[in-house]
């Protein structure tokens, strides 16, 4: 049996991204981010200062959080989960969660589908 051809071929070109060429968006005094989007997923670099609190929220997107430096404490369903350097946390769609930076932290988030609220700046839960 030969290879199966895809039913959908992307209209997007292949793109190479360089983090140092992507603008840093200051979301709050405690949190900044860089965003790369594809057709159906989003990759972000997030910089959180120690003590930064991302308030409780949920979203349609499935989320993978990979801590590169530092540590984040998540509160999910009444359970505390600490994610440290080199660890990845998977958060399914619509699961309410909040996070606190236990130290200065650099992490990457992958979202699918794309977080449109981040692109159009309607992610006002950061400012509550």
Which functions belong to the PLM regions below?
Residues 1-40, 123-128:
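A short, N-terminal "cap"/entry segment at the start of jelly-roll beta-barrel domains
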Residues 34-37, 46-47, 54-59, 100:
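Short histidine-centered beta-strand/loop micro-motifs
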Residues 42, 64, 71-73, 80, ...:
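Structural motif
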Residues 47-49, 59-74:
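Short, conserved beta-strand element in jelly-roll/cupin
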Residues 68-69, 84-85, 103:
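A cytosolic small-molecule/anion-sensing beta-strand core signal
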Residues 78-93:
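Short acidic-glycine-tyrosine-enriched beta hairpin
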């Amino acid at each position: 049996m030969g290879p199966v051809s895809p039913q959908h071929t992307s209209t997007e070109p292949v793109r190479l991204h360089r983090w140092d060429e992507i603008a840093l968006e200051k979301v709050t005094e405690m949190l900044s981010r860089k965003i790369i989007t594809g057709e159906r997923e989003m990759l972000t670099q997030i910089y959180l200062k120690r003590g930064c609190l991302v308030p409780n929220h949920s979203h349609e997107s499935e989320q993978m959080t990979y801590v590169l430096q530092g540590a984040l404490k998540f509160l999910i369903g009444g359970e505390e989960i600490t994610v440290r350097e080199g660890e990845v946390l998977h958060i399914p769609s619509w699961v309410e969660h909040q996070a606190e930076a236990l130290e200065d932290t650099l992490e990457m988030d992958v979202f699918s589908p794309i977080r449109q609220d981040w692109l159009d700046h309607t992610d006002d839960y950061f400012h509550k």
